[in-house]
Amino acid sequence: SFENGLEGWTRVEYANGSKTLLEVVDGEGVNDSKALKIQQLPENDKCCVGVKRTLTDLEPDQMYRMTARIRYSDIPNGQGTGPVIFRPNSKQYWNSSRYLYGTELKNWTNVTVDFMADDNGEAEIVAALGFWQGGMANGGRSTGTAYFDNISVVKVTDELFTLESEYMRIFIEPSKVNISVQVLQQWLKNLDKIYLSYLELMGEVPHEGRKLAIQTTKGIYSGYWALAGYPILWTANGTAVEDSFSQMLQHDDWCFGILHEIGHVFNIGDTSWNWNDEMFANFRMHYALEKNNGKVYMDGRNGKQVFTGGEILDMYKIDYENTIGTKVNDNGIHYMLARMAASITWEPYKKTFNYLRKNGGSGTNKYDKFVHFVNTLNRFAKETNPDVDVWDYFSALELESIKKQLN
């Protein structure tokens, strides 16, 4: 509560806070108690302003739930996040409570956000109008008025559905779990295989080698299915989780979306060479699926189908065929880069990623980075076969189409 004013809290201005009203007011809290009020008028533009405090004596690497009660008014629909609570974290930028829009002053809205404590048993928490990160599709920042009260934090590791394997941990909202523990255990074993293959390809592991974590959250922008980081966020809005679990049961699906996000997590080291990690997250997955005979249930040439192992190349070939004649898309570039593996093997790719991870890229635009990548791959391919030239795998039409996409 805020009965003692802002004792223990500190005002924080992430964006445009010079004209933001932030105060503790009487009679606006639960049962007419005191509440934190934050107000940003539309004429002063969108903001992210709130209060923060650092929690101590938490259990390291355990899941905690921050809860607050909020009333709000005049929050433009779809503008930023509205009033939210969150834990600012450089390893996972995007986690927050669910977004609130419009006006609801008569009743209190309960919101929650789950987060992991740091290794030192600390965590910074924030209650704010608007979100600390502006680089999201809705802009992050907001205007309007919000009242916060009854902020609390409790450990919830045991309240979530939790399961772990050698390299993975999942923290899932229990109502989302619609398949057996045995099926999920097998999935985590499959993710362990993927993890080791990503390590083979990239030459290093992320997050100091700790187990990667996946957690469900309602505080995720509606356009996002999941977001990479530590932990990986998986939307609890809608039925994304349940649908994925059902596909695991029906099709032995390893879950393309989660494999993609883990692929992002392995974008490590000097990443200046990387012109598009949406593509390279899938490229890492491609290698891992081929090496482990993994399965994903995705759109094929005649509707949904299971792609097993190296069959995944054909999924990317579909886009290649549909776009190569004009401006090839990223999936088409993926196809062209991956098709050579059947001839030159994956070893030059491993050496290429390991080299680039340590040394970075060359060139200021995307096409220059593409050229640097292929030249590096070519250099390592020649170590095995001096007669090979990977540029020979690209036609003039293909290179022209790639230029149109990357310039």
What is the meaning of each model-derived region?
Residues E242-T308:
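Zinc-dependent metallopeptidase catalytic helix centered on the HExxH motif
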Residues Q182, Q186-K193, S197, D253-G257, ...:
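Extracytoplasmic/secreted proteins, especially bacterial periplasmic and envelope-associated proteins
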Residues L201-Q215, G269-N274, V296-G300, Y349-Y355, ...:
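Surface-exposed patches in mature extracellular/periplasmic domains of secreted proteins
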Residues T162-L259:
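Juxtacatalytic substrate-recognition/specificity segment
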Residues Q405-N407:
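Non-catalytic terminal regions of proteins
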Residues S1-D158:
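Extracellular and organelle-lumenal recognition/adhesion modules and their flexible linkers in secreted
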Residues Y198, F307-I402:
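Active-site-proximal alpha-helical
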Residues E166-M168, E204-A213, E261-H264, L289-G294, ...:
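Loop/turn elements at helix/coil->beta-strand transitions in domains of secreted/extracellular proteins
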